[in-house]
């Protein structure tokens, strides 16, 4: 096994362990690990990304935000570069939800190229998931508001990966959102 493959599998295993008790909010209660795996797959299979640190960060992007993982732990196991990317894409859960959403829009243009890639793939995965199956308790209006907010975040990520941006644009247009 190549060392890059081993590093990516280590990140996948770490994320699976950290997210093992978590489920997505869809009616099927999909295992949460499907999300970071899907984000990494979008980057590699659709975005053409081969950068090991970006793929590791995609797998780990929700570990600090949604589990007891620390940034120090990410750095210890995966290095400074992966830690930096994960740190850039992690919301501060001590802040109210609307403030976190506002900060995502505000910070998007200032993220590193690597963090922007993870953010693009994360948004694409989440929007596809919303189209596939509405989370329990979500109205059509809430889905539309999420699409609108995501389109504002993506505006700040433009110029990062034309393939992923094009796929997002099609999703926004299908929802009647101008790009």
Curated annotation (Swiss-Prot):
Q: What is this protein called?
A: Guanosine-3',5'-bis(diphosphate) 3'-pyrophosphohydrolase MESH1
**SUPFAM superfamilies, alphabetized:** HD-domain/PDEase-like
**What residues make up the catalytic site?**
65 (nucleophile), 66 (nucleophile)
The reply to whether Ubl conjugation figures as a keyword in the UniProt entry is no
What Enzyme Commission number does this protein have?
A: 3.1.7.2
Q: Which organism is it from?
A: Xenopus tropicalis (Western clawed frog)
A matching Pfam family: HD_4
For activity, the cofactor(s) needed are: Mn(2+)
């Amino acid at each position: 096994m190549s060392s890059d493959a081993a590093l990516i599998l280590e990140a996948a295993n770490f994320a699976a362990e950290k997210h093992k008790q978590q489920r997505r909010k869809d009616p099927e209660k999909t295992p949460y690990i499907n999300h970071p795996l899907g984000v990494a797959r979008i980057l590699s299979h659709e975005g053409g990304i081969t950068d090991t640190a970006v793929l590791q960060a995609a797998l780990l992007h929700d570990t600090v935000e949604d589990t007891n993982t620390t940034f120090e732990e990410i750095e210890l196991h995966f290095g400074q570069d992966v830690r930096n990317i994960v740190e850039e894409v992690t919301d501060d859960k001590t802040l109210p939800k609307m403030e976190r959403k506002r900060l995502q829009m505000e910070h998007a243009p200032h993220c590193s190229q690597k963090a922007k890639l993870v953010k693009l793939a994360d948004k694409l995965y989440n929007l596809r998931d919303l189209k596939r199956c509405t989370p329990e308790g979500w109205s059509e209006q809430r889905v539309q508001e999420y699409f609108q907010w995501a389109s504002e975040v993506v505006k700040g990520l433009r110029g990062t990966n034309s393939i992923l941006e094009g796929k997002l644009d099609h999703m926004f247009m299908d929802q009647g959102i101008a790009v």
